[in-house]
Amino acid sequence: MKLDNETIVHRYGKALFELAEEMKIRNKFHSELQEYKKVLQNEPQLKVFMSSNQISPEAKLKIMEILKKDSSKLMTNLLDMLYDYGRITSLEGIIDEFDRLNDEFEKTVRASVITAIELDEERKQKLASSFANVVGAKKVIIDPIVDPGIIGGVILKSESYIYDGSIKTKIARIKRLLLK
């Protein structure tokens, strides 16, 4: 039975997280995974190269050796296993799953903050602190997004929470009430 990518990503991410925690290298391994994630994001053609049937296995193995250089034993084993099972293109998803589990473990919430204007660091910190209190997190990592279309106010979105305090939404609510 062939597994879909979502199942692969979930299983490998969970196994890696549990193994890294058991080996007491979770934070260090998390940092190492972030370096690989940067490489994958900065070199999108790497995924295409590694999944292409037109590229020889020898060429792919040379790239694998470069990728494994200076890697931890756990990372080297992961890369070898993904390559051997033809799942190397799932690496970024596996890293994302590890990140999700790590955030859950650390009680960290990632949230998009949409505002009409760019926020200074002080306002970002205040929003992060307030949002952390609301959702019961120790830490909130904010991804600021500027959207002049919301007119004013703020929209906060995390995996399990949405707060829309934008002027645009308030105007829409008033409009609906007036049209009733």
Curated annotation (Swiss-Prot):
Alphabetical UniProt keywords: ATP synthesis, Cell membrane, CF(1), Hydrogen ion transport, Ion transport, Membrane, Transport
The keyword Transport appears for this protein: yes
Pfam assignment, any one: OSCP
A molecular function (GO) term: proton-transporting ATP synthase activity, rotational mechanism
Cellular compartments annotated: Cell membrane
PANTHER family listed in its UniProt record: ATP SYNTHASE DELTA CHAIN
Record family assignment: Belongs to the ATPase delta chain family.
Alphabetized HAMAP family for the sequence: ATP_synth_delta_bact
Protein purpose: F(1)F(0) ATP synthase produces ATP from ADP in the presence of a proton or sodium gradient. F-type ATPases consist of two structural domains, F(1) containing the extramembraneous catalytic core and F(0) containing the membrane proton channel, linked together by a central stalk and a peripheral stalk. During catalysis, ATP synthesis in the catalytic domain of F(1) is coupled via a rotary mechanism of the central stalk subunits to proton translocation.
Subunit and partners: F-type ATPases have 2 components, F(1) - the catalytic core - and F(0) - the membrane proton channel. F(1) has five subunits: alpha(3), beta(3), gamma(1), delta(1), epsilon(1). F(0) has three main subunits: a(1), b(2) and c(10-14). The alpha and beta chains form an alternating ring which encloses part of the gamma chain. F(1) is attached to F(0) by a central stalk formed by the gamma and epsilon chains, while a peripheral stalk is formed by the delta and b chains.
Name this polypeptide is given: ATP synthase subunit delta
Species assigned in the record: Ligilactobacillus salivarius (strain UCC118)
Gene from which the chain derives: atpH
